[in-house]
Amino acid sequence: MDNRPIGVFDSGLGGLTAMRELIRTLPNENILYFGDTGRVPYGSRGREIIRKYAKQDMNFLIRHDVKAVLAACGTVSSVARDLGDALPVPYFDVLRPTARAAVEQTKNGKIGIIGTAATIASGSYRKEIERLAPNPDVYENVLHDVLRPVSLQEETGVSHQRRVITAAHLVE
């Protein structure tokens, strides 16, 4: 049995959700989590900077002798998948499972994608959804003002009130 940990990383702490699911489904596995709270959020940065950070994050985990890497960051999954595929250990990200869940759950073929500027600009989620479903009706929206408060709450524990107000403003 391979006792090395599974490495999980995100640009902040949002990937703790993925880590929690790993713990639930693989309770006997060791997990090493890296949340890059010093450079969060990645999604407002340029593609090459995101790729640089992702490579550094992946290399950090490899140096800690992980047996697999999970990029629990939608932005990294969108713009740096090829870097993960080049790792010497199995690589997983959140793009395909997220797109598959959206396709499976829609009842009318309409799918909304919210994400960082880099995620939306990459078109990765749209392409994956279109690969999985015939003629989906995909709507994409960059939510600058919502994603930062989510990151801030994760980092500081500050109330979600501002996030709710911002989200309400977007639907008016």
Task: Kindly give the residue locations of the regions a language model identified.
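Non-catalytic structural scaffold of enzyme domains
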Residues: 1-172
